[in-house]
């Protein structure tokens, strides 16, 4: 009788108990080799775990419950999402997805640059804000254009020149670098160009989650869509002058290399400079020092033109956390620049869900939902932008609320049957100093 290799393997597999077979294919790590991701680990307090930083492989075991994984896996994604693989025991109920990575967004590649977007189409909860990540090499131009939505931007790397025109006919030119912002109100025409030595990369933010980068009003698109006789009449030139205009939109393209602003500023008889300032140096702001990091807030208070977008730039130190809080006036749209974090969103009715974020991720937290941002790493900082479709930045601190509410009221709510616990808690909040990023406990 002849046996195939496969039949021999199958008979061997059937001879082994299923639990043993599973462990052979997916070995159960001991506590020393895989941290808390094993059936023996007990953690009643749901401590954070930096699986990526500590090279651990998350598995769905929690306090003795759970099992191995037998099906297809993406281990890299699992390591980036330890609190999805093993959620805190306090998670309960259902929430829409609140996380998207720009790494999962389609990239449009053009001459000397590229662009990708995160909108309500990619992330269904991103209803108030859309984001675009764009790269322009040295001399590369994002062509003259405008759009229905206001545009706010943060320079991630490199140097960029912006131009704009206001409704009074005033022109504006500025050169920006990492950490700088610009804001163009709805309908205001503008352009962008990468500067020496390596161009630029930036995050664009629009005050409408349904924005589409493919549907902006482009100069070349309009000109090619207009009869040449009309162009001639509008510019008082012969129609033949427009024979060589582009036959299709340019969008992103290699331009001639820019000179200095002084050399390039228009100098016609009726040219005038805008009275508006479309740019702002966010990272040059004096930061608010906290016990766990640095906070910079930019809204219409210190960047007056930015009427529809407010933002905070946070440096969350190793082991620190953005305190428990909520925002009453807008959804939070977060962009993670550096580090690894976990965020638990409290949605009322006993519903809470924890998400993990790494560099390049977008997070959404609907207005009024309580949350925090905890740095998973004890060695590296988290750098994140909190962005809001709002004129001013607003938040409520749970710590301040507890400290500025009558002690009896607080104790009756939380520690009615625990006088000792009440005493410790009330002492901790008796001086409710503002501390939006809290240092790790010593």
Q: Which positions does each model-derived feature cover?
A:
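Glycine- and acidic-residue-biased ligand/ion/polar-headgroup-sensing regions
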Residues: 138-141, 146-168, 318-321, 326-349, ...
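Short coil/turn segments at secondary-structure boundaries
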Residues: 146-149, 165-168, 196-197, 204, ...
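Fungal secretory targeting signals
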Residues: 1-18
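Active-site-adjacent segment of 2-oxoglutarate/Fe(II) JmjC oxygenases
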Residues: 199-257, 381-436
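Short acidic-glycine-tyrosine-enriched beta hairpin
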Residues: 136, 152, 166-187, 333, ...
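Ligand-binding loop in jelly-roll beta-barrel domains
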Residues: 16-21, 177-178, 183-213, 331, ...
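A short, N-terminal "cap"/entry segment at the start of jelly-roll beta-barrel domains
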Residues: 16-130, 230-313, 317, 323, ...
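Conserved SET/PR-domain catalytic core that frames the SAM/AdoMet-binding pocket
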Residues: 132-133, 137-140, 185-187, 312-313, ...
